[in-house]
């Protein structure tokens, strides 16, 4: 049986991960992944430096290795009023995948972040916590995926996310939210 393993939510040392982008890609390639996205945390303070570094690293990896490495970013703990602007800026800087740090129950994420995210130009609402049906419906209409998270803590609400997606027609994606080799 042929299977394809991808992960579109992973972190390098460009934010709070511990591996370089190259080592992250190499380890994933050795484990049989066919594609990964490097989606380091950004806000208005670092988006202009982090995204171009991810793009450069992914371009070099893709020239030499079989694993497809996709440059991305994760908008994290920002004022909800600038989520849309940051999504546009990250894409303009060359990122191919935009994810938003959703309202996980294990961090003090600003209420309304999920809603602002599904109104913005993002691809995945990661660890969306106790997402409501209205936001899940908007995600479904805009082809924004809701994440089922493999990360400790964020995974507490996976059942709710799955049921809400099933009820509203939103698409799901499983990601690890990896920050280290043990993730």
For each feature predicted by the language model, list its residue ranges:
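Histidine-centered catalytic micro-motifs
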Residues: 5-15, 38-41, 128
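Short hydrophobic alpha-helical runs that function as membrane-insertion/retention elements
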Residues: 36-38, 126, 147-148, 172-176
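Residue-level marker for buried hydrophobic side chains located in beta-strands
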Residues: 4-6, 37, 71, 174
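Short acidic/histidine-rich active-site segments
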Residues: 41, 170-183
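Metal-centered catalytic cores of metalloenzymes
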Residues: 1-5, 14-34, 46-49, 55-65, ...
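Short, charged, surface-exposed secondary-structure boundary motifs
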Residues: 108-110, 134-136, 155-160, 183
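Extended substrate/RNA-proximal surfaces in nucleic-acid metabolism proteins
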Residues: 47-147
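Catalytic metal-binding/acid-base residues of hydrolase active sites
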Residues: 11, 42, 74-76, 103, ...
